[in-house]
Regions:
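Flexible, glycine-rich terminal cap/loop adjacent to redox cofactors
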Residues: 9-16, 20, 25-37, 43, ...
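FAD-site-proximal beta/loop scaffold in flavoenzymes
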Residues: 158-175, 262-339
Length: 468
């Protein structure tokens, strides 16, 4: 049995784990990372953020080429080469994973391939694919094992006609028709992809609207845009039964009013969320508290066990790659004894959904702000009034700023439309620096740009937007 001594050992190499390892190396700590997959990067790099966004990009290019004539460009015989789409996706995934390997070497992080298990105090047991074990001596441990697809009883996947978000990334052909169960980020993104690739697509959502965690006006705009693109939305509906048919699947259910719903398609995508992955970690018998599957931590990501931290999808904060990365940095800086480490402000975590049109948001929705007792003022600017949006031919959507009347504090920003997932960063910076809506509106933005819509929405809080 080999013995190694580390300042910190991280279990999991996703965006939380590998970023934590890099920061540890930057601070001069001897760091190890344990990963059971053959490649580094976790769900985000291998089966999540990166491959899905690459497929979305391919779908966007395909759609743009179909509308080339709108820009005075004649293109004929445009065809989708789905096999090449998959090759491009795999190439980008591999490049990103290799990039993480390089960063581990650059920051002198030792990588162990295998499954990590806590052997407290101060040890991590690593078992490789052949069953060989070794023990790492470590002063601190960070659990960053991520999440897995949540199974739904009665809607078990088979990888053929009933698939999850992992399966649908590896399809050989585009299905003729697709039912998407769940209208969160994963559901609406894949609906956008496969609809643009030619699948007759229907989204079914239990709650009354698409992307139900977003501002209600954003949800309504997305449903309108989807309808325009031929994507059908069946909201406020609970699916109760799945049947296999000769050509695919049939799902049946009821709306909240008791109306029967039956939909048939070649394929069903079950996209109803993920659950923390803590299997085999050896948490039993420790002081680490687990509630509803999530590891409980304090503001610095510490568990109840001294020297053991947890970050990312295994803790009860939003399951977002960028949040996991920041949690990893907080954990490492805290265990390193940095005096300037600050807890994460969860009000300033951006949410991005890469459907078409894109959605980006940060902070409170209008409804939530009112519920919390704020005297709310709203500024809103449509992209239909943006010169740059007209140039792009992408005039759907708007920027909405929710502010507090007395102090002009920006409480939330909600964007649906072109480059929303990029624009939201400006809102995050403004809120982080405690900018008022007035100050944001007075900040000069270059013309013509999509970002001018943020400035105009901020001016709109005080009814001073110029171009509407």
């Amino acid at each position: 049995m080999a013995n190694e001594q580390f300042d910190v050992t991280i279990i999991g190499s996703g965006p939380g784990g590998y970023v934590a390892a890099i920061r540890a190396g930057q601070l001069g700590l001897k760091a190890a990372i344990v990963e059971k997959d053959n490649r580094l990067g976790g769900t985000c790099t291998l089966r999540g953020c990166i491959p899905t966004k690459q497929m979305l990009m391919s779908a966007h290019v395909y759609e743009q080429m179909q509308h080339a004539a709108d820009f005075g460009v004649q293109a004929s015989a445009i065809q989708l080469a789905f096999g090449d789409v998959q090759k491009r996706k795999d190439k980008v995934v591999l490049k990103n994973s290799k990039g993480i390997e390089y960063l581990m070497k650059k920051n002198k992080v030792t990588v162990f391939k295998g499954t990590g298990r806590l052997a407290l105090p101060g040890k991590v047991e690593v078992t490789d694919a052949e069953g060989k074990k070794q023990t790492l001596q470590t002063k601190n441990i960070i659990i960053a094992t991520g999440s897995v697809v949540r199974p739904i009883p009665g809607f078990e996947t088979d990888g053929a006609h009933v698939v999850n978000s992992d399966h649908i990334l590896e399809l050989k052909d585009v299905p003729k028709s697709l039912i998407v169960m769940g209208a969160g980020a994963v559901g609406v993104e894949f609906a956008s992809v496969y609809s643009r690739f030619g699948a007759d697509t229907t989204i079914v959502e239990l709650l009354p609207r698409l992307v139900p965690l977003e501002d209600e006006e954003v949800s309504k705009e997305l449903e309108r845009s989807f309808r325009k693109r031929g994507i059908k939305s069946q909201v406020d509906t609970k699916l109760e039964k799945l049947e296999k048919t000769g050509g695919g699947v049939r799902v049946t259910g009821k709306t909240s009013k008791g109306e029967a719903v039956t939909i048939e398609a070649e394929m069903l995508l079950v996209a109803v969320g993920r659950m923390p992955y803590t299997e085999g970690l050896g948490l039993e018998g420790t002081k680490i508290k687990v509630e509803k599957g999530f590891i409980q931590v304090d503001e610095f990501q510490q568990t109840g066990e001294k020297g053991v931290y947890a970050i990312g999808d295994v803790v009860p904060t939003p399951l977002l790659a960028h949040l996991a990365s920041k949690e990893g940095i907080v954990a490492v800086e805290h265990l390193a004894g940095r005096k300037d480490v600050r807890p994460i402000n969860l009000r300033l975590v951006p949410n991005c959904t890469y459907c078409d049109p894109e959605v980006g948001s940060v902070g409170l929705t209008e409804a939530k702000a009112k519920e919390l007792g704020y005297d709310v003022k709203v500024g809103k600017f449509p992209f239909s009034a943006s010169g740059k949006a007209r140039i792009l031919g992408e005039e759907e959507g708007f920027v909405k700023i929710v502010s507090e009347k007395k102090y002009d504090e920006i409480l939330g920003v909600h964007i649906i439309g072109p480059h929303a997932t990029e624009l939201i960063a400006e809102a995050c910076v403004a809120m982080q620096l405690e900018s008022t809506a007035g100050e944001l509106g007075r900040t000069m933005h270059a013309h013509p740009t999509i970002s001018e819509a943020v400035m105009e929405a901020a001016e709109g809080v005080h009814e001073l937007a110029v171009h509407i």
